[in-house]
Amino acid sequence: MKVKICGITHPDDAREAAKAGADYIGMIFAKDSRRCVSEEKAKYIVEAIQEGNSEPVGVFPEHSVEEILAITEATGITSIQLSGEDILFKFSQLREHFSIFYVVSVYSNGQPSAALPPMNDAVTVVYDHIGGERGSPFDWKAFSPFQHNNWMLGGGVNLWNIKEGISLLNPRGIDVSSGVERPGILRKDIFLMQALINSAKELSSSTL
């Protein structure tokens, strides 16, 4: 079970997430996000996890290929998360350079908002509650993932519902942001991260 801690805004949070066993550390570059980071801050975050095994992921919802290449080169980011328009063109231009995550937005009723574009299992599909930062899950019981082996469950996952999500859907990974944050601020809670990552790894082992 892979775990991605997304929306990291501080190097200390990234370092603690890596120590706790996070496989991926996500940084958001969407300017309309409260968790948006600058290139300078992203570079410090990447440096904070260099000694561990966590992989830095840049979240680029509407950026051009040229912008993505420039930001990743400046920061040291090695994986990217894509969404938005011209996705097949971006895949063709970027797949040789990066590991790629692709976001599929899901409505509250558990229905994906769009069909899955053609892609191979090297791309990790992330299912996220439409709206992105609502902090609540879509209807997992009504949800059925596309026929794509490599996928993560996101959108409202937290320590209190992770067991239900894994039991119902058996995803290959978990993507969490607000579910491990301190109340009222955009910083991650060390103990919540540790507990959620441990739960994800233990629960995935028990379902094998």
Swiss-Prot record:
NCBIfam families membership: PRK01222.2-3
Superkingdom, natural source: Bacteria
SUPFAM superfamilies in UniProt: Ribulose-phoshate binding barrel
Family under the similarity heading: Belongs to the TrpF family.
EC number(s) stated in the UniProt entry for this protein: 5.3.1.24
Taxonomic placement: Bacteria, Pseudomonadati, Chlamydiota, Chlamydiia, Chlamydiales
Reaction(s) this enzyme catalyzes, per UniProt: N-(5-phospho-beta-D-ribosyl)anthranilate = 1-(2-carboxyphenylamino)-1-deoxy-D-ribulose 5-phosphate
InterPro entries: Aldolase_TIM, PRAI_dom, RibuloseP-bd_barrel, TrpF_fam
Keywords assigned: Amino-acid biosynthesis, Aromatic amino acid biosynthesis, Isomerase, Tryptophan biosynthesis
Keyword Plastid set for record: no
Keyword Isomerase tagged: yes
Main EC class the enzyme belongs to: isomerase
Protein name as catalogued: N-(5'-phosphoribosyl)anthranilate isomerase
Pathway(s) annotated for this protein in UniProt: Amino-acid biosynthesis; L-tryptophan biosynthesis; L-tryptophan from chorismate: step 3/5
